[in-house]
């Protein structure tokens, strides 16, 4: 089992010459081989926590450690942001290869990853021919192309319409089942969290609470147990 172990984490920002503490004395384990959702209101620190896990954000004190069963601490991360960040002058195929300086990604690799996100026939298209949902799928394929151990995703579907989001949630679940890659996914949407997650980490007022869901994805969020879970999470987020 792969996981991130966070010990005694403190994160402080300086604002108007004052120290503002976002996290204090946080101890947490986050699975790196499930779909783990980090859930909370805007400004609660979801993205900051994701950036800390990715090594993009310095911590004020404490430790963040990655462990797996083989005691191998080397790992690769794939990042997917809210904006797809595709280069408009490059085709889908070339966007996926944009960081492939050693030409390790073959045409068959690109076909395979685009097939995973249901875009196999779109590799010659340019971003201006893609919908928002299609652009997000390309961003996911691009992240997968570099064979990461873990995908970190920062509210990648939040700007999309309901139906596109539902389709992409299903795509994400299929990717997890087919590749067995861990996914850490940030959202503020409770329904989305329950639908896709194995674990949900709720952040509220600097406090963390983890819920584990045993049902396979996608969940039927209208089941009584999930309606009760939704109520409990809403109370935490008040």
What is each residue range found by the language model?
Residues 4, 23-25:
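Conserved structural motif at the start of ABC-family nucleotide-binding domains
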Residues 61-73:
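Conserved ABC transporter NBD signature motif
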Residues 206-232:
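Conserved beta-strand-loop-alpha-helix hinge in the C-terminal portion
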Residues 105-122, 174:
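Conserved ABC ATPase "signature" region
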